[in-house]
Amino acid sequence: MRKGFGRLTAMLLALVMLVSLFPTLALAAEPVAADSVYRNGNIYTVDEDFSTATALAIKGDRLIYVGGEAGVEAYIGPNTKVTDLGGKTVIPGLIESHMHINGLGESLLIIDAFWKPKDVILEAVKAEAEKAEPGAWIQGRGWMNTVWENTDYPTKEELDAVAPNNPVYLTRADGHMCWVNSKAFELAGITKDTPDPQGGEYLKTEDGELLGCVTDTAMYPISGLIPGFSIEQKREALLLAQEQLFSYGLTSAMNAGTSVEYLNEVYKPLYENGSLKLRSYLLISLSSLESPEAEYLRTTKPEGGFYDNHMDVRSVKLFSDGSLGARSAAMLEDYSDRAGHTGNNRFTDEQMYELVKLAYDNGYQMGSHAIGDAANHQLLDCYEKVMAENPREDPRLRIEHFQILTLDDIQRAIDMGVLPSMQTTHATSDMLMAEDRIGTERIKGAYAWRTIIDKGSIILNGTDAPVELVNPYHSLYAAVTRKSRLGEPPEGWHPDQCMTREEALRSYTSWGAYGEFNEDIKGTLEVGKLADFVVLDRDYMTCPEEDIKDIQALLTVSGGEVVYTRDTSAPAVIWNGLPLTFNSKPITEPGSIYVPLNDTVNGIGAAVVAGKEATVTLNDKSVTLPVKTVDGVDYVAVRALFEGLGRNVTWYAGSNSVSIGWLK
């Protein structure tokens, strides 16, 4: 080995000397004609130096040139497709480092309860029950009691009133609690005397009756009764999720929990027929040493790069606890708002160790869910033990969420090389109840991005969709400001823990690629890497801070192929990071955009008194403005409306969109 290495070194040295003596040899190879060129752009490569460029050239699925305008000319041949970016901003294809791809898709097939008022959810359940056969299950996902006027957990009686003849199963946004009715409890054989399982709880009223909310492992006896989606429905759901991801410029996504059946029956066929183009990093779900997934780990080596670098199967998902919102996150000490309760560990220490050992000893990366400080501590103990017993080069073990830790455990994790996979919008959602749950002292080790980065670690960012909206620009905004997409609180929640804009972008690009062992092929725009990138309607690095949440993807390119193009034929109004929904199209006239009055005031939650003029009131601001009626629909000028309500209005021509800023 040493002798061969010496010969190779001598040959390389000779070649270096030759090139130095005859530098023209280094330039002898002519640049090849690119398949496509994108030029005249504002390109953030997110390389080590965070350098910028103006042009990209692509051959096949790879970048063959990244640089300036003069240099790209050599790559333009007679058949090269050239796109003038017109100065628009380009960033690497975004990497969603923690979500449930199938869960997002399947949530689009059931009742959408995402952060909606309780009465709206109950109306949706009632509507489903009226058209469903008696006994048919009614499902939904996304409710969040912390945003309701009454933040108490909901009851089974509320669902009984609107769906007495159908079992109802509504999953909380975080996926760690369900809200069910009496029919669902009856079918599952669950009564007030049913004992809580390890890692779950049947919540009770003060007099010991079933409340109607169930957490974590206690959900399984009920969810197991619900007829599953067919294979065709699962494939449809996955493609729906892909469509949504591409629309945001997300070209890669980690799926936080995949069964062997789902891998073989859904992912592989869709990749094989060419309809699935999303790059997926799949974590195999592991909950038992006797499961099909455990057997898969014993018999199948971890591998990546399947289907031309579109699928990796080299990591394992474990659940160690539940969620903070459901009070099922495992804590070292009692919850501050529930004496005598410390949450739920899914497994004993020995059970967790055996599961971690199985995955680790078979060469897999770990991507284990841990919210509470006790759950994180348990995982770190197990990681530390298996790493000591069987040292492996560069295992890149991850903890998913890495949400609440003691300061000592944060340092321990970083010293061990454990990668924190965090979701920045979790902080801005949980801020509504986090300090009530764990108090002011423990919050110092929670959602502590600045602390983690300053100690020398990177952070892998994502949304945990469908727990949160999959929009990455909400996450980037939260990372930089510590505010929700509503702009709250105005000064940011614990703003000392903010990331810089560069760090936040790295958390969605180069750092995300490193978390997948894919830093050599994606995450930055460099020659030789995959041509994955997104064109934005504004400059992420320099736009007003409050506009980050409103960024729109104009074009998404994966492996050189355009997989999404934004429709800019009609103007969009972006309110609190989301486009308002209009039943009638806005009207564009020279210098003005008119929006449907009723659709707009309903979308922003304002009151209106309308006639020949309309008076719109939002909070303590009112504006009176003329009404234009077209085909029976009343319209008002968008700028006059929102500036009259004390808001900033910014027009982005590239996306034909208007961003509505915060109150002045």
Language-model-detected regions and their locations in the chain:
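Primary recognition of N-terminal secretory signal peptides and signal-anchoring hydrophobic helices
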Residues: 567-664
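Bacterial N-terminal signal peptides that target proteins for export
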Residues: 1-12
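Acidic (Asp/Glu)-rich catalytic clusters
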Residues: 270-274, 300-311, 390-392, 413-415
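His/Asp/Glu-enriched, well-ordered alpha-helical/loop segment
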Residues: 356-367, 371-397, 401-402, 407-411, ...
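Sec/Tat-exported extracytoplasmic proteins
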Residues: 76, 129-133, 163, 271, ...
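Divalent metal-binding segments
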Residues: 30-39, 44, 48-297, 314, ...
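Sec-dependent signal peptide cleavage junction
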Residues: 19-31
